[in-house]
Every structure is written in C-alpha cells, then in structure tokens.
Swiss-Prot record:
PANTHER family: CARBOXYLIC ESTER HYDROLASE
Keyword Zinc: no
Enzyme Commission code: 3.1.1.1
Lineage: Eukaryota, Metazoa, Ecdysozoa, Arthropoda, Hexapoda
Gene Ontology molecular function: carboxylesterase activity
Function: Overproduction of nonspecific esterases is a common mechanism of resistance to organophosphate insecticides.
Homology family: Belongs to the type-B carboxylesterase/lipase family.
Source organism, top-level taxon: Eukaryota
Natural source organism: Culex pipiens (House mosquito)
Coiled-coil boundaries: none
Reaction(s) the record says it catalyses: a carboxylic ester + H2O = an alcohol + a carboxylate + H(+)
Swiss-Prot/TrEMBL keywords: Glycoprotein, Hydrolase, Serine esterase
Additional note from the record: There are two such esterases: A and B. Alleles of both A and B are known.
InterPro entries with a match to the protein in the record: AB_hydrolase_fold, CarbesteraseB
Name by which UniProt lists this protein: Esterase B2
Amino acid sequence: KLLTDQDMQDDIFTPFGPTVEPYLTEQCMIPKEPFEMARTAWGDRIDIMIGGTSEEGLLLLQKIKLHPELLSHPHLFLGNVPPNLKISMEKRIEFAAKLKQRYYPDSSPSMENNLGYVHMMSDRVFWHGLHRTILARGARSRARTFVYRICLDSEFYNHYRIMMIDPKLRGTAHADELSYLFSNFTQQVPGKETFEYRGLQTLVDVFTAFVINGD
C-alpha cells in the first residue's frame, strides 16, 4: 500500500505524479512548481480547447466502493477545501460548512446517496483546475480559449462508465467522450436516428473545426 489513509481522505488516488526535478539540465522538464511554470507557459501564446464531462466525479466512486467509510468521515468536506489556501482552521471549517450546504443541503452522503459526492468530486478534482486555468489564460494571454462541457448520458455508449465504473450508474463520466471521438475495440456505431449519433457528429465537428480552422 503506497497510499496512506490521509492520502485517501485528501482524494490522492495515485502515488505517481509530476515531481519537481532537483537539477536544472537541458533534459529537465519540471524545474519548478507547475503553478510557477504556468505563469510563463509557452502555451499561453496559442489557442487551446479545454473541457471535460458533466459527471467527471463518477471516476472517484471506484475508490468509495473500496473505502465506503470515507463518505461518513467527519473531515469529508473539510478535506475538500483546497489545501494550498493560506487560511486559518476556523476559515477552513467555515468553507467546509458551505461545501456541505452546497452538495448535501438536506441529507448526508452515503453509498445510496452519492450524487452530491459525485458533483463535489467533479468540481474539486476536475472543474476547479479547469476553471483556474481558463481564468489565468484570460488574464495573461491574448490567445483564445475554447471551453466545452460534454453531457451525453447514454445507456449503452458511455463505455468507460459502463466497463470501468458501474454499468448501473448514469451520467457522463471521465473519459466517456473518447467513445464519441474515436473508434474503439467495441466497433460499435450508434444508429443514425439516436441522440448518441447526433452527439458523436457534434463532437467530431467541434474538434475537427478547431483543428482545421482554429475556432
């Protein structure tokens, strides 16, 4: 076990990730904290398209199935206040109460009542970082930023959710959009009369238009 109980509580779901390299050489890729590197990133000079799915947080249910006690942990909401904020514990507790009110205003999280958790993890693990990136580019970049949010809740075509998370769940999970953009091992093509096919056409049109025309 490489992850500690505290890591699990902090939603660190992999022991691997970018590491600041201690020696500055020609081959060095991460000489300082990514937050600092982003302020002078060459990517700010080019147009980008960035986005995600509506229920990215479904991915985190895999962890909850293994550790359901995390949903009743007293620090569930406190642990989702960004750890890098330089604020007092009293302020953190205040923010944690606001998170509870936002995602579970009239109930408590549980395996049967996990939708609030899914939305909180979608925001905390994925959309919060996307939002900060979009705002940062708007403040310091003259290049354009195109943002997409994909919500295609299919019973049969959201392959990542069905095969990797839970076939009984609904929503558009992390990586579900790949089935609409690329062919895969299922060799499955939805019928032209379905909303899945219309979603496929729309996504391919959006991405190819960006590649060809830059908008």
